[in-house]
């Protein structure tokens, strides 16, 4: 006599009739239905999450980083990085000159309409008002950062020089300089600087600093030149920094002390 399988019905004696257990096929059907229900619920959750994410949209980054490779046929390449704050219409250029461990931070602040220079090795900031060309440079920096690609200047990069006269007697109130300038120059004196156009006299780089520049420990450079017009007065060059822009223009910004 063969043993009864799990699918065979086993009648139980009783006056009211015969009761049977569910077959194996029934259990399989119930298990498949439960598995199918779980898969459907998981799929609904994925779709709902995708719809919610698309409704909110991807978060727009406030800061974009633009890294620049700067070829120079005459000197080693500086390390330069540009951090652009699109929401605040501002860009901070960090430049580390060749063979130096000290960086410069140059802030283009579109909200306050100023450019701030902060040499790391000196406890001082230089502030000047933006001109139309500076606003165009800031717009170019913001637009270039949106591409999110490294920018490499072409071989026909134009090099120029900019002289800024530092007015040591005019210290800027940080409360009037704007939030970004305050953050960059925290607990650091800020002095007004202006372009040297209209200034005059010889430019000398080999001389001992005097006044507040001497207190900063600034060392004069071996630079000689001449400003074209006006009364002839000696000018001492103390600090210079080279900055390159996506417009294929590299500028050597030099500061000199304007006597009181």
Swiss-Prot record:
Region feature Disordered, mapped onto this chain: 1-21
Any Pfam family hit: BRICHOS
Subcellular location as annotated: Membrane
SMART domains in the cross-refs: BRICHOS (SM01039)
TM segment ranges: 32-52, 236-256
Chief subcellular location: membrane
GO BP of this protein: regulation of cell population proliferation
Residues modified by glycosylation: 79
GO cellular component term of the entry, any: membrane
Bridged cysteine pairs (disulfide): 125-185
Extracellular-side segments: 53-235
Topology with respect to the bilayer: Multi-pass membrane protein
Keyword list, A-Z: Disulfide bond, Glycoprotein, Membrane, Transmembrane, Transmembrane helix
Coiled-coil ranges from the UniProt annotation: none
Domain of life: Eukaryota
Protein name: BRICHOS domain-containing protein 5
């Amino acid at each position: 006599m063969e043993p009864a399988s799990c699918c065979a019905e086993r009648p139980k004696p009783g006056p009211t009739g015969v009761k049977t257990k569910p077959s194996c096929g029934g259990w399989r059907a119930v298990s498949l239905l439960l598995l199918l229900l779980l898969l459907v619920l998981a799929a609904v959750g994925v779709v709902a999450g995708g719809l919610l994410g698309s409704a909110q949209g991807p978060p727009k980054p406030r800061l974009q980083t633009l890294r620049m490779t700067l070829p120079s046929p005459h000197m080693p390449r500086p390390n330069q990085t540009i951090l652009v704050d699109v929401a605040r219409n501002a860009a901070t250029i960090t430049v580390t000159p060749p063979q130096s461990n000290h960086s410069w931070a140059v802030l283009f602040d579109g909200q306050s309409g100023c450019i701030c220079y902060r040499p790391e090795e000196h406890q001082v900031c230089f502030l000047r008002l933006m001109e139309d060309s500076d606003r165009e440079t800031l717009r170019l920096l913001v637009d270039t950062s949106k591409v999110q690609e490294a920018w490499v200047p072409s071989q026909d990069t134009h090099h120029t020089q900019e002289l800024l006269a530092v007015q040591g007697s005019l210290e800027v109130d940080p409360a009037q300089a704007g939030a970004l300038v305050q953050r960059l120059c925290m607990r650091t004196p800020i002095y007004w600087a202006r372009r040297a156009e209209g200034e005059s006299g010889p430019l000398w780089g080999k001389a001992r600093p005097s006044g507040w520049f001497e207190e900063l420990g600034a060392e004069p450079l071996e630079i000689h030149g001449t400003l074209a017009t006006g009364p002839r007065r000696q000018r001492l060059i103390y600090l210079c920094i080279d900055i390159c822009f996506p417009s294929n223009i590299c500028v050597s910004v030099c500061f000199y002390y304007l006597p009181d």
